[in-house]
Amino acid sequence: MLVVISPAKTLDFNKINETLPMTNPKFLKEARVLVEELKNYDSYSLGKLMKTSDKLSLLNKNRFDIWNESFDNSRQCLIAFKGEVFKGIDVGSFNVEDLFYTNDHLRILSGLYGALNPFDGVNPYRLEMGTKLSFNNYKNLYDYWGDKLKYKIIEDIKSTGDNMLVNLASYEYFKSIEGIDLIDTSVNIVTPIFKEYRNGEYKIVTMKAKKARGLMVSFIMKNKINNIEDLKKFDLEGYLYNEDLSNNNELVFTLEN
């Protein structure tokens, strides 16, 4: 079983974990191409491209200008990313065995790096997968990453010993690998969905759903889950599997108030 999630916009590079290895991202060469292209933008143009404030645009410009492939200013991405999903994962509660299992069974999709193993070292950056970066003959980042990212994820699924992909990424990021089950028909994609009962109906509450995705990552990694039936046993923070709302492709977990 392989799990995919989205990265976070929020980063914390103050913490250093020297006990864990730091590895090179698989698509470091491809990331370098993107960085070199983005260095051509001034902060104003970068802000328009990424729809960010002047302050954040200047920060991103500076980040791209000093980006490099050494580990001098890198952190393991699982440690560096923050936000609701990563709050739910709570990597600080993992033991060493959990961390190494996570490195084998989790991939973080990335606009800049394509796909990251948890121990992969990253520089501070922000580049969302949906950014409409057009250069050379590429229409956008989806076009840039194309089949090479899809085949990498298929390879990583196979490396876990089965054919299951658990999609805990947002659609913006999952879209970059959408269709891998058509390239390899043995791949089985399951998407957990988290809903809360409000005003007489079950609704997706965005912030809670994001944290729930992280909670499920934690549940899978700590319990070494490797099949759908055990996945359905997820029960953290009151969520329970709702068979009536689920189907073969979507596992719905609901929270009652």
UniProtKB/Swiss-Prot annotation:
Pfam families: H2O2_YaaD. InterPro entries: YaaA. GO terms for cellular component: cytosol. GO terms for biological process: response to hydroperoxide. PANTHER family: PEROXIDE STRESS RESISTANCE PROTEIN YAAA, PEROXIDE STRESS RESPONSE PROTEIN YAAA. NCBIfam families: PRK02101.1-3. HAMAP family: UPF0246. Belongs to the UPF0246 family. This is UPF0246 protein CLH_2088. It comes from Clostridium botulinum (strain Alaska E43 / Type E3).
